[in-house]
């Protein structure tokens, strides 16, 4: 039986979905958050977002070398009590994989991102929760899964 060229892409997408179901992609990365025990309002504070990438997998860096690849991006839900000053992404590993013709910028193992933020000075409560999301595309040496995201929260105790 010959596969028509029109049907081949659909067959490949369906077949890849069976081998690597979408639910696999959100199990490739765990997100851990490290923050100081207490933060002061109106002062720049740094938090660490640690992406723990499962062995045998990698994710594209924040600035992939190929514009067609999905970058790893951290974002935060709008919160009027906090101001994100800067997100510092780690240096990627530059390597060439079996399926790639050119070099790629990747994170593998553990990637540590720094978030510089400031709680607004007129914030009066003793605690604050900041919700964020990391978007990434997990890949191994044979294939890439669909881009996915994982939510995380930063819980802050505010010094009065």
Protein language model regions, located:
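Extracellular/lumen-exposed scaffold segments
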Residues: 22-160
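Bacterial Sec-dependent N-terminal signal peptides
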Residues: 1-25
